[in-house]
Swiss-Prot record:
GO terms for molecular function: structural constituent of ribosome. Belongs to the bacterial ribosomal protein bS16 family. InterPro entries: Ribosomal_bS16, Ribosomal_bS16_dom_sf. This is Small ribosomal subunit protein bS16. The gene is rpsP. GO terms for biological process: translation. GO terms for cellular component: cytoplasm; small ribosomal subunit. PANTHER family: 30S RIBOSOMAL PROTEIN S16, SMALL RIBOSOMAL SUBUNIT PROTEIN BS16M. Keywords: Ribonucleoprotein, Ribosomal protein.
Length: 83
């Protein structure tokens, strides 16, 4: 099953996540099909907290990809911010 989930990056105590489309059997930070955005939970000031390619996210959801709980919340938040 294809899922849209977060892959952790960044450094210790400073997380940074990529929104990735991947096969659910792959490791969290392992192989992915496509990166469709990022989420920076510790962004401050002028830093961008969330960026999502809405067009690609809609495409993958249309193809049957299942978003994780957190990603579903982030996609809703990103759609609200662009509207």
């Amino acid at each position: 099953m294809v899922t849209i989930r977060l892959a952790r990056g960044g450094s210790k105590k400073r997380p940074f996540y990529h929104l990735t489309v991947t096969d659910s059997r792959n490791a969290r930070d392992g192989r992915f099909v496509e990166r469709i955005g990022f989420f920076n939970p510790v962004a401050s000031g002028a830093e961008v907290k969330l960026s999502v390619d809405q067009e690609r996210a809609a495409y993958w959801l249309g193809q049957g990809a299942q978003p994780s709980e957190r990603v579903a919340h982030l996609l809703k938040e990103a759609a609200k911010a662009t509207a």
